[in-house]
């Protein structure tokens, strides 16, 4: 955990989570995991498949409740909130970027980016204006009327990032944002995400198996068997520990 938590975006303290139908079939996925994400930093969550990364992130975002421990998002304890409150709070404060772009092929880029705004009650006019501004932010301001099928993979991921940013969330959560991209395009996406974290002073959390992007992190949290094994902070320490990983 970072020494300075005054700029804390989200925290998980001693989180436990099991799945199964009874004592004999219980699978203990999280075993006392603790993690903190801060504003202005890019945090990478790494570890082998099945170690609990997705479950941990689901609890941090309020889409899953822990069996024990405390989840806090921007100062609010999620366990003390009603499901409807969590849904609204998550929608206001978190933007999501996934491995699959999930763009609607029949809609223009602006219409795709505007979808979450329209769902949350924004007028069509305001949603379109905000969508165009978000697309300009990711370098696609001249493609607002283009359909997704005419874009490269990297450009489609930029649209997905614009959609995540359109409502100005304080936390961006990314699940394998570069795995479907080539090295050069992935580097461009990571440069942009780091800019969002460091320059815009947002919190960015990335779940990844891609060692090529470790160098972009301000901090790396390594998970194994339902626990956070260790955290590495600082570019030098990250480079020494992780950048020698074969890839």
Identify the meaning behind each predicted range.
Residues 219, 227-247:
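Conserved beta-strand-loop-alpha-helix hinge in the C-terminal portion
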């Amino acid at each position: 955990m970072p020494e300075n938590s005054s700029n804390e975006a989200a925290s998980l303290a001693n989180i436990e989570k099991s799945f199964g139908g009874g004592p004999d079939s219980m699978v203990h996925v999280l075993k006392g995991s603790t993690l903190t994400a801060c504003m202005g930093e890019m945090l990478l969550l790494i570890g082998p498949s099945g170690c609990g990364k997705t479950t941990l992130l689901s609890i941090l975002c309020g889409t899953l409740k822990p069996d024990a421990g405390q989840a806090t998002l921007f100062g609010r304890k999620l366990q003390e909130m009603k499901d409807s409150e969590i849904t609204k709070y998550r929608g206001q404060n978190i933007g999501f970027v996934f491995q699959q772009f999930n763009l609607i092929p029949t809609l223009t880029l602006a219409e795709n980016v505007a979808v979450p705004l329209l769902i949350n009650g924004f007028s069509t006019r305001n949603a379109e204006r905000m969508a165009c501004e978000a697309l300009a932010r990711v370098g696609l301001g001249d493609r607002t009327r283009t359909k997704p099928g005419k874009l490269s993979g990297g450009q489609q991921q930029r649209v997905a990032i614009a959609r995540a940013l359109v409502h100005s969330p304080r936390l961006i959560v990314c699940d394998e944002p570069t795995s479907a991209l080539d090295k050069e395009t992935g580097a461009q996406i990571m440069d942009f995400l780091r800019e969002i974290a460091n320059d815009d002073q947002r919190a960015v959390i990335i779940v990844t198996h891609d060692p090529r992007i470790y160098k972009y992190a301000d901090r790396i949290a390594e998970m194994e068997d339902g626990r956070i094994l260790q955290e590495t902070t600082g570019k030098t320490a990250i480079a020494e520990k992780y950048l020698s990983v074969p890839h």
